[in-house]
Regions:
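Small-residue-rich helix-interface/hinge motifs
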Residues: 3-101, 401-423
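Final/C-terminal transmembrane alpha-helix of multipass membrane proteins
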Residues: 434-454
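Terminal peptide-recognition signature
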Residues: 19, 57, 128, 163, ...
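Functional transmembrane alpha-helices
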Residues: 103-119, 224-248, 253-259, 263-264, ...
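Juxtamembrane extramembrane loops of integral membrane proteins
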Residues: 71-78, 158-217
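Internal alpha-helical transmembrane segments
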Residues: 64, 90-159, 445
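Residue-level signature of transmembrane alpha-helical entry/exit and packing/kink sites
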Residues: 1-4, 8, 116-125, 132, ...
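PDZ/PDZ-like domain segments forming the peptide/carboxylate-binding groove
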Residues: 137, 143-176, 180-183, 221-259, ...
Length: 459
């Protein structure tokens, strides 16, 4: 378990290092002095100085910073204009101003962030997210090169179903659904998960020929035994319904289902089948939790289930591709991750998914640790590939989140710089400072709430 957590923290740290290194290397390229390059927050554990930069590893491993000379974040506590005199400053603000002046006196201010052109500053701020996307691409190359990609090939067609009426056949490859591009099976799965009742205008290829058809899902109401869990494809429980048999029995989010009644489970479909065919008898789940296998016995409950059946099944098996194909589908992998993050944010704000879906650093480490544990049975290479897959997703996620126009994040700072480029003059520093300060406070509050949720989910 300790090793799993260490690996998870290591991966997150690498993602942060790459982000901050993006800022660092582009700042250096533009002649900007980097005062401090740090990994983590809090007290310094290890630090040394090389040239004009102090390099630090700090106590809390989540996060990092690339602090540049003349960067307004160097003196976040001073939200005063240059015209303010010392009598109007609080003791804390005076101390912050002294620190700022001490730093400025020790360096050449012509190498400060603020002294550079607006386009140089835009490049420096944008570099962090861009490097995250580059890291996601490198991880994707390793994954696709090793395992291939997962096209949306139709594997099974049910008799007398909407799929047969639409003329679909086994082996057809879906490339578009209702105007949404489908490169991977996951594209189709994600769309269907939140649009199950919609008629599907499908573009597909058969023997190299492009074709179109329309599938109207069949609305089915039936009685089924359920326990009240949501799973991903790898049998990892993403959520447990409140007051459900699963919650009462003790199943938890992030448990990984390994077996049901002693039978190993290969995917989420096999788990669902085991539950629905139980006939209401008690079902014993063997789940991986905190590095151990735990048995949890649940009594399924009969509920009326509404579903929309298309009549075809896609397994999403990966297939190998050429070196050129590897590069192509690696770019598509990054695009998929970016698109998924943006769509998930949209669904979060529209209420399609709940706040419980958010994960902070603790929740992310916990989930990564469980996935590492789940992968061990397949060998070290698959542990490595699963970590690479998570790194690609998290790195792309970090890139997108940092580009959002939120004060105190890279995206918020880019907004002010773009305004400066369009106006030909910067926004007043005191105004920008106030906005960034408020944004930072709100961001810290959100982080604390998510952190609290993550910690409570561990118990």
């Amino acid at each position: 378990m300790v090793l799993n957590v260490f690996l998870a923290i290591l991966v997150l740290s690498i993602i942060v290092i790459v982000h901050e290194f993006g800022h660092f290397i582009i700042a250096k390229a533009n002649g900007i002095t980097v005062v401090e390059f740090s990994i983590g927050f809090g007290p310094k554990l290890i630090h040394f100085r090389k040239g004009e930069t102090e390099y630090c590893i700090k106590a809390l491993p989540f996060g990092g910073a690339c602090t540049m000379l003349g960067d307004e974040f160097l003196e976040m506590s001073v939200i005063q204009s240059e015209e303010d005199n010392d009598e109007e400053l609080t003791d804390e603000e005076k101390e912050a101003k002294k620190r700022k002046l001490a730093i400025e006196n020790g360096y050449d201010m012509e190498k400060s962030f603020a002294s550079k052109s607006v386009w140089a500053r835009i490049a420096v701020i944008a570099a962090g997210p861009v490097f995250n996307f580059l890291l996601a691409f490198v991880c994707a190359v390793v994954i696709v090169g090793s395992l291939g990609y997962d096209p949306c090939d139709i594997d099974v067609i049910k008799d007398n179903s909407p799929a047969t009426e639409a003329g679909l056949q086994e082996g057809d490859v879906i490339t578009k659904v209702n105007g949404h591009k489908v490169t991977f099976y996951r594209d189709f799965y994600f769309y269907r998960a939140y649009n199950a009742d919609k008629t599907l205008n499908i573009t597909f290829t058969r023997d190299g020929e492009k074709m179109t058809t329309t599938v109207t899902p069949q609305h089915i109401k039936q009685q089924k035994y359920q326990v009240g869990i949501m799973m991903n494809e790898n049998c990892l429980i993403s959520s447990v319904t409140k007051d459900s048999p699963a919650e009462k029995a003790g199943l938890k989010a992030n448990d990984v289902i390994k077996a049901v009644n002693g039978t190993a489970m290969e995917n989420s479909s096999s788990v669902t089948e085991a539950i629905t065919s139980s006939g209401g008898s008690s079902v014993t789940f063997t789940v991986a939790r905190d590095g151990k296998n735990v048995d949890v016995t649940v009594e399924p409950k009969m509920v009326e289930v509404e579903s929309y059946d298309t009549g075809f099944v896609v397994y999403g098996d990966r297939v190998k591709t050429s070196p050129i194909g590897t590069l192509k589908y690696s770019v598509e992998e990054v695009g998929y991750s970016v698109k998924t993050v943006i769509q998930s944010l949209g669904m979060l704000f529209t209420g399609k998914i709940g706040f419980d879906s958010l994960l902070g650093p603790v929740g992310t480490v916990s989930t990564m640790s469980e996935i590492v544990e789940e992968s061990k049975a397949d060998g070290a290479f698959y542990v490595f590939l699963n970590l690479m897959n998570l790194a690609a997703l998290i790195s792309a996620n970090l890139g997108v989140m940092n580009l959002l126009p939120i004060p105190a994040l890279d995206g918020g700072r880019l907004v002010f710089l773009i305004i400066e480029a369009l106006r030909g003059k910067p926004v007043k520093r005191e105004h920008e400072g106030i906005v960034n300060f408020i944004g930072m406070i709100l961001l810290v509050i959100l982080m604390v709430v998510v952190l609290f949720k993550d910690i409570m989910a561990l118990f």
